[in-house]
Design a protein with these regions (language model features):
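N-terminal pre-catalytic "stem/leader" segment of glycosyltransferase-like enzymes
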Residues: 1-38, 107, 124-130
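Short, polar loop motifs at secondary-structure junctions
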Residues: 17-22, 45-51, 96-102
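Membrane-proximal helix-turn-helix segments that form the acceptor-binding/catalytic region
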Residues: 30-37, 76-93
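Short N-terminal targeting/anchoring amphipathic segment
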Residues: 32-50
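Active-site proximal beta-strand in glycosyltransferases
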Residues: 41-43, 56-73
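A short, active-site helix/loop in glycosyltransferases that binds the activated sugar's phosphate group
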Residues: 52-53, 90-114
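Short hydrophobic/aromatic-enriched beta-strand-loop microsegments
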Residues: 61-67, 111-118
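Short beta-strand->alpha-helix junction loop in the catalytic core
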Residues: 69-71, 115-126
């Protein structure tokens, strides 16, 4: 993942929002709360953080990158959480593999926007060019 993001950042403007510094990243690393003022396209692969995507008022596009089904680890999953992540109209869905497409589309009643394996450079470029 880090290698792909570093390669992508060489030719595209790229920011990473993180709770801590990531020394091996060769791009802008900012604290997570800075995402609330970010006016570009934002992708998160964290289910917890995806719940905040609809609150990011300045974002041009919001993507939830589903690599794993994190929500299955919760004991109780209120509908409002699903509504604010998988079902929210301003959040586009990206999945890790083609095997996930049917399940996620049935669960969310939305089309999966991209299939992106491990932060694939070609898909990141397509998203940047949208």
């Amino acid at each position: 993942m880090l290698n792909n993001i570093n390669t992508f950042a060489k030719t595209n403007l790229c920011h990473v929002f993180s709770a801590s510094l990531i020394p091996s990243l060769q791009t802008n690393v900012m604290q997570r709360y800075e995402a609330f003022h970010f006016n570009g396209k934002i992708i998160t692969d964290s289910f917890r953080l995806s719940q905040q995507l609809h609150h990011l008022g300045y974002c041009k596009k919001r993507y939830y990158y589903i690599q794993h089904y994190e929500w299955m680890n919760t004991q109780v999953l209120p509908y409002t959480i699903i509504k604010n992540t998988l079902l929210h109209p301003s959040v586009e869905l990206i999945v890790q593999s083609q095997d996930q497409v049917e399940l996620i589309e049935q669960l969310s009643n939305k089309k999966v926007k991209y299939v992106m394996n491990n932060w694939d450079l070609n898909i990141l470029s397509q998203i940047a060019d949208e």
